[in-house]
Amino acid sequence: MKRILFLITMIVSAATADAQFVQVKNGRFMREGKPYYYVGTNFWYGAILASNGQGGDRHRLHKELDRMKAMGIDNLRVLVGSDGERGVQASKVEPTLQVKPGVYNDSILDGLDYLLYEMQKRKMVAVLYLNNSWEWSGGYSFYLAHAGEKNVPTPQDAGYQKFMDFMAKYATNEKAHQLFYNYVRFILTRTNRYTGKKYKDDPTIMSWQIGNEPRAFSKDAIPAFEKWLRKTSALIRSLDKNHLISVGSEGKWGCEGDMKCYERICADKNIDYCNVHLWPYNWNWARKDHLSEDLERSCQNTKEYIDEHLVICDRLNKPLVMEEFGFPRDDFQFALGTPTTVRDAYYKYVFSLVADNAEKGGKFVGCNFWGWGGFAQPKHEMWQVGDDYCGDPSQEAQGLNSVFAGDISTLDMVKEQVNRMSRINH
């Protein structure tokens, strides 16, 4: 009898522990045994802000987390850390976490620990991305350089087309992959010095994400790209059986326009849910001097893009999260306090697409707007060392896509969406 009671206790304890982690059941997110629909944001600089070194400001971190939590935002998408030497290129986020392969900045690691500790206290969860196809945090270009590639270009010097053509080498560079896998092993086997929990046992982490907008960068590289994603997801699963895994893909735009590629990378048995990103200005749906006039086209293209991906999510029975979307401020201004009329209209439309689908039992279960600027006070149009971090990384104008604490009309709309999503219980 005692043995039976012991086994029952163990089973119940295991089920309770599992329920603490965000899970996917029948194409939906579940958190603590309840359906989880959410409005989150991108807080890429969270680990830097939480650090005790350069760039760290824990007083501001607490204010930002408290403000977000008060609004009902409980899902933050965060960069684990930037890669590379400091002071090499103006467009890269500093300070970096991985200075050279296997050489780490303990201050940023401490910051990541502290961020998760503070998020845990507020019952928030994090989506942590490990790589980046773009130069602003190192990523592909960092690993290629340390795998022996010479004269690795930056978009600022060579232009984006030459940069992307060069980055296509990453998909087939096995040495670069091995350097990245070493990094994955290091991060996923870490123990948080503030909570004493191993990362793999911490429910504050919702998902490990392979990268920020991973791309093949050429149609010829797609097979190798897909193979790399599969190997990475399998590695993550071998190290961590508790957490969700996601790709971080933009969708069709990140798959060289190939929806079959998107379906294959989402169908991977180790990938738990699907992602899309939406960038009307970056994708030439909206022109900087005609933002208002191009709003209707941006909304129409957004709906078509989402619908196309939802078909695949329905087929795979996996949830969809739009984990990045943004729109410039009116008249392409950047300064604090400048109007956000057109942005607000775009946000309102995007939010309606998410909630309308979720309320009908669809697979569209959440979104993270880009990005949280909060209480930042940018000093320069382009970020310089010592400036506040905001939603726009260092390669972009500060304020371009940031939502600041003073953007009341936008934040009110976010709160309305939070309330609407929180009422969905199926």
What are these regions (language model features)?
Residues 17-19:
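Boundary at the C-terminal end of the N-terminal hydrophobic targeting segment
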Residues 4-13:
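Sec-dependent N-terminal signal peptides
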Residues 21-288, 292-320, 325-425:
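Active-site mouth of glycoside hydrolases
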